[in-house]
Amino acid sequence: MSTPFVTTLSPSLHGLLKDRLEEKGFILTQPQYTIFQARSPSVTCVLYSSGKLVVQGKGSKEFIKFFLEPEILLTFTHNRVEEDLRPRLGVDESGKGDFFGPLCIAGVYAKDEETLKNLYKTKIQDSKLLNDAQILSLAKTIRASCSCDVMILYPEKYNELYGKFHNLNILLAWAHATIIDQLAPRPSGEVFAISDQFASSESVLLNALRKKNTDISVIQKVRAEQDIVVAAASILAREAFITAMTKLEQRFSLKLPKGASAQVKSVGKSILNSRGKEVLSLICKTHFKTFNEICDSASA
């Protein structure tokens, strides 16, 4: 059995952690002496009344590395340090963990020092720290000063591609590589790209890039959104997701919740019962276990 991860969580982050865990589909309860206990098939996360946070389970290592540290524990340390004025390209995605709606991937190319200085003058930061109104406003600023590209994979296309790749990380690598290839200068010279490390091995993205016509070097790291160009890309990806969700809701006359929570499953069951499996498949990611749970509940 692995050793539990233990830390103390600032009270200001309690609500954020609870909301994000619900969005990710964790089942929340409140045993005695706790603020909440959250469970998934591979991770148990307990926040005690004292503020002590305990994480354990076979999936805890990935949970901490790819979610807890970059999205929760380091949220309050997102203050800018030294300005990096090296020309570079940033890429990020939105919608990966949302049952309903598309997967959106965006890239931003800041070509020179002037462009980067303009970005540093704004309130650009990781899109997870911004509300929808701030996202939409900052997206206009980013487009006015940078070269940008956005890919929106609506559920119908997303499900088709997932059927081809059979793996979310390989699909993400293909999409990231496509955006990087579209924006990278030729020759790339000293320009480089930065991407979040979404797979356990850097080779997944590198293999996808080898199939493209670019020689640009890529840095992959956890918490890549702390770089202002990646943060700008995360804002454009989130803007695309917000806009695409609105279009889906209007097209199907439905209100679609974000994330993968119990509410999402409830709405999914309602859509299946009233509109059928075909419509549900056009608005959700069918490889999510939530899809099978919804369909199984209807046939039970």
Swiss-Prot record:
Its main location: cytoplasm. GO terms for molecular function: magnesium ion binding; RNA binding; RNA-DNA hybrid ribonuclease activity. One of its GO terms (biological process) is mismatch repair. Manganese or magnesium. Binds 1 divalent metal ion per monomer in the absence of substrate. May bind a second metal ion after substrate binding. Keywords: Cytoplasm, Endonuclease, Hydrolase, Magnesium, Metal-binding, Nuclease. The keyword Ligase does not apply. It is found in: Cytoplasm. One of its GO terms (cellular component) is cytoplasm. NCBIfam families: rnhC. Belongs to the RNase HII family. RnhC subfamily. Endonuclease that specifically degrades the RNA of RNA-DNA hybrids. This is Ribonuclease HIII.
